[in-house]
């Protein structure tokens, strides 16, 4: 038989076993929030890792890897008269620079694809440039051919006859005449971090990628210069 409850006896708490106290509910809620936050952080990290692993590569990375390897190969020859050459440490495709030939026809650096180019920017107001020009002319005479050309681009912005007169005065006979009267070619290389003053020289491989860059003049026709450029061309 069910025992009778005394008149003053409190009712039994039938919810005590099923309803946790409020502090416990708050603790459970906080744990759930922490778990959700941790899961979100893990998801963000995983998405970031996936994105890094699968992001598109710079097209220059693959195309210009050979130029970086060429730079490493010739690094031991960066000495003496060409000690100031900075060989490429990372793949860099040289901008497709625009300039003109002696007849005023439009050219681009990409017109030399398949050939190694020693690109030189010079001006008549630049004393080191004028002194360097005979060495560049001699280098073209020694090594110029189907696989290599010294491309010296004048960037005088006034009096287009002045650079031509200078080249005639110093008997430059082997260099073709190229010019950019806007000097935009210099600004493009400067923006790319490859030009800081005059003269500026960039050795460009047949794919249009930087092998090395030099700020300032050099005796390019010296034994050091000829050996360096010949090595870049893989000539024996």
What are the functions of these language-model segments?
Residues 1-93:
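N-terminal targeting signals for export/organelle localization
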Residues 86-91, 96-117:
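A short beta-strand-turn-helix
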Residues 92-94, 112-114, 145, 158-161, ...:
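Extracytoplasmic
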Residues 113, 121-138:
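Conserved redox-active cysteine motifs that mediate thiol-disulfide chemistry
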Residues 116-117, 148, 199:
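Alpha/beta-hydrolase fold active-site loops
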Residues 121-123, 153-156, 180-181, 214-217:
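Active-site-proximal beta-strand/loop segments in catalytic clefts of secreted hydrolases
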Residues 131-171, 181-189, 227:
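Structural microenvironment flanking redox-active thiols in thiol-disulfide oxidoreductases
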Residues 165, 169-174, 180-232:
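Thiol/disulfide oxidoreductase modules built on the thioredoxin-like
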